[in-house]
């Protein structure tokens, strides 16, 4: 059984984690991290469990096709309240009319529903492809993110998730870019994110760039991109299941100080053949970074025929709560 750690134990075992991890990844030099520095955080870590609506992917998609089937976002929010989540990450895909924005009447109704439940929106997110060689594809993604920044502002959501990876029909960023160099593609992605971040600054919404296992599949790649964007309204969404390295915990530790949102997954590479995530270790890393805010979990089918959102989500939430309690500084 896990037991709470003392303040001395916690500081001894975790305060040096990001530095040690970063050094192992070859990024902590004498000058430290020179760009994309995280914002100042005071008051110690405070972690609030949230749920990414994508955990109900199949049921939400079924409802979109037939309102008599599955569940909608309102029911997802009810589920969050019933199980004691503090927030909900309402992915844009599941709003009516996506990729277009829903009308204000819908947003107001959903926002009031969430308020009545005592919840908050921890974020939203859209699809975009900034690795595409076609500038029209990149421009389309910029406009979509800008539109959903305004949606987020209306809902009171602090972040909009953006991808730095390719999207279908492309199989990877190399195909999407037409064989362009990594540096060229990073420049495309950074330029698009800078424009999005400028728009986010006007509305008080942060563009949260998620690692998704393609163009961004390591912590150093994630940090390199943020350094190139170099905008205070662009930061990291750390997906614990999409750093495709030998030691994903090192990547997570490197990026934790730059995180404004999370996707805590069940396994380290979002497959049932990869190791189960050590939530106590993840939470220790998050605490060491001083992060204060929402920690959304996301469960996925991952090929399981018996996957049931209503079973897996409470199970993972209980494990996250146990990890939070076990790492509480006493």
Roles of regions detected by a PLM:
Residues 2-159, 180-187, 231, 235, ...:
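N-terminal pre-domain/capping segments
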Residues 87, 159, 261, 293-294:
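Residues at the N-termini of beta-strands
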Residues 92-106, 129-133, 168-172, 212-219, ...:
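Acidic-and-aromatic substrate-binding clefts and catalytic sites of carbohydrate-active enzymes
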Residues 119, 205, 289-293:
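A short helix->loop->beta-strand "cap" motif at the edges of active sites that frequently abuts
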Residues 152-175, 203-212:
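Active-site groove signature of glycoside hydrolases
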Residues 186, 190-284:
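Acidic/histidine-rich catalytic cores of soluble enzymes
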Residues 280, 287, 293-298:
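H/E-rich (His + Asp/Glu) clusters that bind or coordinate divalent metals
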């Amino acid at each position: 059984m896990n037991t709470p750690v003392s303040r001395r134990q916690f500081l001894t075992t975790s305060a040096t984690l990001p530095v040690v991890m970063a050094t192992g990844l070859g990024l902590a030099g004498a000058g430290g991290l020179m760009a994309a520095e995280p914002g100042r955080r005071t008051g110690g870590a405070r972690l609030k469990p949230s749920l990414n609506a994508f955990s109900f992917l199949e049921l939400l998609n079924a409802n979109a096709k037939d309102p008599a089937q599955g569940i909608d976002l309102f029911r997802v929010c009810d589920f969050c309240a019933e199980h004691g989540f503090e927030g909900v990450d309402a992915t844009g895909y599941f709003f009516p009319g996506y990729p277009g924005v829903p009308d204000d009447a819908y947003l107001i109704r959903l926002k009031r529903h969430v308020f009545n439940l005592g919840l908050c929106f921890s974020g939203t997110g859209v699809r975009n492809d900034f690795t595409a060689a076609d500038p029209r594809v990149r421009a389309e993604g910029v406009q979509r993110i800008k539109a959903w920044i305004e949606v987020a502002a209306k809902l009171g959501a602090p972040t909009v998730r953006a991808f730095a990876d390719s999207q279908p029909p492309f199989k990877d960023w190399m195909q999407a870019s037409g064989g362009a160099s990594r540096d060229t593609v990073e420049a495309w992605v950074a330029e698009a994110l800078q424009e999005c971040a400028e728009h986010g600054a006007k509305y008080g919404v942060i563009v949260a760039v998620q690692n998704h296992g393609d163009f961004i599949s390591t912590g150093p790649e994630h940090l390199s991109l943020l350094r190139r964007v170099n905008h205070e309204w662009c930061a990291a969404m750390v997906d614990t299941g999409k750093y495709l390295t030998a030691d994903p915990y090192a990547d997570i530790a490197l990026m934790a100080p730059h995180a404004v949102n999370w996707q805590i997954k069940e396994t380290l590479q979002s497959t049932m053949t990869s190791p189960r995530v050590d939530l106590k270790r993840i939470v220790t890393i998050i605490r060491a970074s001083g992060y204060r805010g929402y920690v959304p979990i996301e469960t996925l089918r991952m090929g399981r025929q018996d996957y049931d959102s209503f079973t897996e989500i409470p199970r993972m939430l209980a494990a996250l709560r146990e990890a939070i309690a076990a790492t509480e500084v006493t």
